[in-house]
């Protein structure tokens, strides 16, 4: 019987497609399982990272189907984004055409892997019907005040000519094209994710144990909650006139260090700095230096050498009443706190570095509880206050509270909570995205489009050159009438950040296609299917997508669309696929084409290798020889199935009548079955299950009992079906009419040991081991132990004989 993967795989893929084999039931009384791998961007070809992501999800989905669960395992396309525009420029093809052609090709590639997707619920986020509901949500958020517009310094990518969210700037560079990002001030739209900062933080506790600790820690750090003191520093009289205001707010998490303040520092974008520039109170050289700082993004600034400029302004210390110089510094960020810091160089490394560079005073006011204070560096740990007025002698923790209380009692400050998390900048100056459904009217201001006019669709007659925003340049598209007054108006020409689309796509899947024109999703569907039971994707999405999706879910809950707080119950973050120790990439020339692997070895080989080579959460090193090894195992597994016979039910086997080798073979088979439940539902260590199945097949070799072979294949095709489905469907169809594709029961007798191994010790020292029947008597055990320990007990008097059942025999001798 020859193994022909091409014929077998084509046969079953055709059958699955014809029978819509993987569509979920609309039977909401059944136990459900929602398995979702993060949907792909339709770049044109799948890569090995896709193969890994979707094979993991497919294995889990197939397992739960066999247990009788109602499984939702959908696929779709994260279809908007800059690569389509870049392709339009490079290949002179419309983004829409490029995108949908890529989707068609990639769908065939994924289907060729035998992935059990619900294609009836498939969509692309660039479909107008998807945009319609997204725009409806955006209008709701605008009306609620959750979407707003303001002028802001934003991250600008000079190459892509668009704005980037903070999360899309990686080490000072654009996350897509790697161009250095600069700062630019323009009118932008923001979603008020900060309104949900505390809930996003607190609800991370609900995910503990089900999400990787690393992802939870990354989100917690990104949200960045800190408690401290907020107070106003007032200018002296001369400085107030120059600055145009009486002072500015500062926030500190270390109020215990307030007596050590020797200067204050403002962000280059601070209103005071702006006022000095606009009123021409700074030299051209100073303005140029500040502009250079402003053009650097936050990460570049913080990593760069500390730079500053004295503004010839002074504020009054709120407690000592001393004059404190005011500087502008590149390490102060406008978006954190108030954009101003009280600098305590003695107790902050960053402030210390800056003070040393510019020869500013350093005043120590906290010392360690034990040991000497080292004044050659900043002492940043808690300690005992000194030279701090009435707060001297207190420990840092107590001093913090007392100083906050003093400020509050005297009306000069207050306890405050700050977050590093900033509002989500969602507008992009690009063509290929969801149009923002707002209209600019000269009389009425910004007005949302009427919902009955949705979706606002993109014009197709555009020329994409890479310069500016094609919607802004279009001669007619933006011209419209105001929904409020009926007068002439213009459409908003910005489009939405593509992370908006991926913030709710998992909800769309819950509702069958036939309802999509009427609703974004039905509540009865989300009540049943949500949250996603198992979500699978790369850890690179820990902050970006996963935080936004959590936020969006909470907003949609508050808008009345859903009844849940968190979208993803469990999260598995798979590792990257490497070749020659590096991440696969075209630029490195180390990619492997999945299509070629499938054509040469078959989809089941690709699936088996990808799940066997490493645990899902770890990086996977590509190995041609391991791929060949996976193929050989499947071929052997298929061809040896002829040793089993056809049956519609599991053979009845009398354990007592079997030989030792037959018992061992059964034991290996049932050990693999025992392991499978944990692997498919908790640990996802598919490599260990595959190894156990290989051991079981090896144990079956050499057996002549057809019952043992048949039972072995009944179990093994069940266990391996989620991993190598085509091969297992073919074997099971031929032998068992697929009656074994159900939840199998363990046979406890098969796992029982006939014998036990006992350690033999003489006077407590281990000398040997014996194997005895499980039900051996004490006398039989001692006889065998004495025989093997003969040379250590001969000629000596046995004083005591101890048998510890299942563990050891100890013989005590003297003489």
UniProtKB/Swiss-Prot annotation:
Enzyme kind, highest EC tier: ligase
GO terms, molecular function: aminoacyl-tRNA deacylase activity; ATP binding; leucine-tRNA ligase activity
UniProt keywords, alphabetically: Aminoacyl-tRNA synthetase, ATP-binding, Cytoplasm, Ligase, Nucleotide-binding, Protein biosynthesis
Example GO BP: leucyl-tRNA aminoacylation
NCBIfam families documented for this protein: leuS_bact
Upper classification of the organism: Bacteria, Pseudomonadati, Campylobacterota, Epsilonproteobacteria, Nautiliales
SUPFAM superfamilies given in the database record: Anticodon-binding domain of a subclass of class I aminoacyl-tRNA synthetases (SSF47323), Nucleotidylyl transferase (SSF52374), ValRS/IleRS/LeuRS editing domain (SSF50677)
Compartment(s) where it occurs, according to its Swiss-Prot or TrEMBL record: Cytoplasm
Any one Pfam family match given in the protein's UniProt record, by short name: tRNA-synt_1
Motif ('HIGH' region): 40-50
GO cellular component, as recorded: cytosol
Catalytic reaction annotation: tRNA(Leu) + L-leucine + ATP = L-leucyl-tRNA(Leu) + AMP + diphosphate
Motif ('KMSKS' region): 583-587
Organism: Nitratiruptor sp. (strain SB155-2)
InterPro entries named in the record: aa-tRNA-synth_I_CS, aa-tRNA-synth_Ia, Leu-tRNA-ligase, Leu_tRNA-synth_edit, Methionyl/Leucyl_tRNA_Synth, Rossmann-like_a/b/a_fold, tRNAsynth_Ia_anticodon-bd, Val/Leu/Ile-tRNA-synth_edit
Residues that bind ATP: 586
Protein name: Leucine--tRNA ligase
Gene3D superfamilies in alphabetical order: 3.10.20.590, HUPs, Isoleucyl-tRNA Synthetase, Domain 1
Assigned protein family: Belongs to the class-I aminoacyl-tRNA synthetase family.
